[in-house]
Amino acid sequence: MLPIINVDLDALLANEAPIILELGAAGKKDGRISIDHLNLPGVDIVANLEEGLSFLPDYSVDAIHSSSFLEHIDNLDLLMQEMWRVLKPTGKKHLFVPHFSNPYHYSDYTHKRFFGLYSFEYFSKSNYGFNRKVPQFYNDNSFVTESIKLVFKSPWKYRNKVQEEIWQANK
């Protein structure tokens, strides 16, 4: 699939403003170039990210954001290599993925992979202070992990609160 580029990418790259990508963005976020495989309103570049980011030159991107997208990708190795290729040496990537223990993660048939605490350490040279070291021979990426946040939210927390409030109201 050839990318459909709905923005003047050459002008954006020539500009001094930071280049910030939003991968898997079904809508436009201010100041970011949104990339998705669906040609929806607000999508700047329509591309199959399973094939990488070939439409971007090396070291051209200041930041990459991705939220609840990478679990839908088959070829994560290639996409991570492409992120490494297009990020500037001072570039940052901010990735949010659901933890494998999320009860809703298994119900979504479009989820193709699972992520745990150590998943992104396979793409990092930093080991982030974990006790368990992960193998570093799978790829040539040398991302440095600056922070990891693991959040567990109970899907029943608010349901129980509503039931409690209803019960209290019915006393």
Where are these regions (language model features)?
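Conserved SAM-binding loop
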Residues: 8, 16-101
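Polar/charged alpha-helical tracts
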Residues: 10-15, 168
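S-adenosyl-L-methionine-dependent methyltransferase catalytic module, highlighting the catalytic core
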Residues: 77-78, 84, 88, 92-171
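Class I SAM-dependent methyltransferase Rossmann-like catalytic core
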Residues: 1-11
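Generic structural motif recognizing short loop/turn segments at the entrances and edges of beta-strands
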Residues: 1, 16-17, 31, 139-146
